[in-house]
Swiss-Prot record:
It is an enzyme of class 3 (hydrolase). It catalyses: guanine + H2O + H(+) = xanthine + NH4(+). GO terms for cellular component: cytosol. Pfam families: Amidohydro_1 (PF01979). Zn(2+) binds at H88, H90, H245, D335. One of its GO terms (molecular function) is guanine deaminase activity. Its cofactor is Zn(2+). This is Guanine deaminase. Catalyzes the hydrolytic deamination of guanine, producing xanthine and ammonia. Substrate binds at H90, A91, P92, Q93, R218, F219, H245, L246, S247, E248, D335.
């Protein structure tokens, strides 16, 4: 057995996380120790004898040669939860968040989205928006995010640099689109392939394990066959993740059918071009057939559930229960700016509403619980990005990506009362909490400014 690294910091108090879906562990009187690499080396919970807890604190500090006053964080009546994982966000669209919600997907792209994304050829404009969106995500407790950038190589690299400076964990994708796009916002096939390869190489060369490239064909209608073949090959060669959109909107699905009449389904299009595998994240997936769900499960592809966007653009409601029963990796996505809110807490709430809506028409449907939704925002997301061995909860050996939540902060959006259990207070935070309750944020053990 390998010797554990030296512990440099201890967190003492209530810890809340999930190990399996549907079960939230609420662990009072807990003790977590992390090393200089931000890896959890010690985790013990539910001390019944508080004197023993304090003895263990003193012993760990002594054994590791650290000062108890400087190295122990007593959370008091606050609690610790894992960082949220946003599995689908369009960083440039943050400029439009909260506006342009009056149109369905394809018209929305044409009127609002492509015009703003085309502006990111201006690096001053890009730096302003990208700095703000990353800061906002962090303030809402998002420690890991899958970002779509734009078609612009330099601006996409700039987003990666901003993310790296802020200390966020992220996957950054230079968007690829070489057809069926506006004249002012489109690449040639050669440009898209060349710039994407260059982008991937540049990000990998930076050597930051927290910030990785992700191959990003926008969606099948905007990418030629030649481009999709090249992107599939690139992802295989570099072993990067892949992200795209699938079956978000019925008009989109009909469009794909007209483009690929000889291929069985929209999902099969991605498989045809080697873009559907265990490293792939498909956003939305609202209108999948049973055969497509089976294919996604077989391919070990992940789905990013984006309920705010699905509601806002009138795209439809994903049947989350059906996806979970098919043993598909599933996480949550804000989908800024189709989704108007950057907070994964809000996505959790809308995912529950979305699931409840299926019960209206099917009394046998089992709606999503808040415990299950919390799992999707943490462990579920970690599985989607293939980092469940590193993040998602507080198991020893994982990185310490965490939020300290203060339910009693001045001007908290909710109130707590005598006699309430820790579960009551946690549930209030899930339904009523916001960025005001975020006291501290850590990514791989580093305290993040927000």
């Amino acid at each position: 057995m390998m010797k554990a690294n030296k512990i440099i910091k201890l967190f003492k108090g209530t810890v809340i996380h999930s190990i399996e879906i549907g079960k939230v562990e609420i662990l009072p009187n807990s003790l977590i120790g992390i090393d200089e690499d931000g890896v959890i080396q010690h985790m013990k919970s539910n001390y019944e004898d508080l004197k023993q807890l304090e003895k263990d604190v003193t012993m760990i500090c002594t054994d590791n040669g650290i000062n108890e006053q400087e190295s122990v964080i007593d959370m008091g009546n606050k609690f610790l939860i894992p960082g949220f994982i946003d599995t689908h966000a369009h960083a440039p669209q943050y400029h439009n968040a909260g506006t342009g919600t009056d149109l369905p997907l394809l018209k929305w792209l044409e009127k609002y989205t492509f015009p703003v994304e085309s502006k990111f050829k201006d690096l001053i404009f890009a730096e302003n928006v990208y700095g703000k969106v990353v800061d906002r995500m962090l303030r809402h407790g998002t420690t890991t995010c899958c970002y779509y950038a734009t078609i612009h190589l330099e601006a996409s690299e700039l987003l990666a640099e901003i993310v790296s400076k802020r200390g966020q964990r992220a996957f950054i994708g230079k968007v690829c689109m070489d057809r069926h796009s506006p004249d002012h916002y489109v690449e040639t096939t050669e440009q898209s392939i060349s710039n994407t390869k260059e982008f991937v190489d540049r990000i990998l060369a930076k050597g930051n394990p927290l910030v990785q490239p992700i191959v990003t064909p926008r969606f099948a209608p905007s990418c030629t066959d030649e481009l999709m073949v090249a992107l599939g090959n690139l992802s295989h060669e570099k072993q990067t993740l892949i992200q795209s959109h699938l079956s978000e909107n019925k008009d989109e699905i009909e469009w794909v059918k007209s483009l690929y009449p000889g291929i069985e389904s929209y999902t099969h299009v991605y498989k045809h071009f080697n873009l559907l595998n265990e490293r792939t994240i498909m956003a939305h997936c609202v209108h999948l057939s049973d055969e497509e769900i089976k294919l996604i499960s077989t391919q070990q592809t992940a789905i990013s559930h984006c309920p705010i966007s699905n509601f806002t653009l009138s795209s439809g409601n994903l049947d989350v229960r059906k996806v979970l029963e098919a043993n598909i990796k599933l996480g949550l996505g804000s989908d800024i700016s189709g989704g108007y809110h950057p907070s994964i807490l809000q996505v959790i709430r809308d995912s529950i509403k979305c699931s409840n809506s299926h019960f209206f028409n099917n009394g046998n449907h089992t709606p999503l619980t808040f415990e299950e939704a919390f799992y999707l925002a943490t462990v579920g997301g970690s599985k989607v990005v293939n980092l469940d061995h590193r993040i998602g909860n507080f198991i020893v050996g994982k990185d310490f990506d965490a939020q300290i939540i203060d339910p009693f902060v001045q001007n908290s959006p909710f109130d707590c009362f005598d006699g309430e259990t820790l579960k009551d207070i946690f549930q209030k935070f899930i339904y009523l909490g916001d960025d005001r309750n975020l006291s501290s944020l850590y990514i791989k053990g580093n305290k993040i400014k927000f």
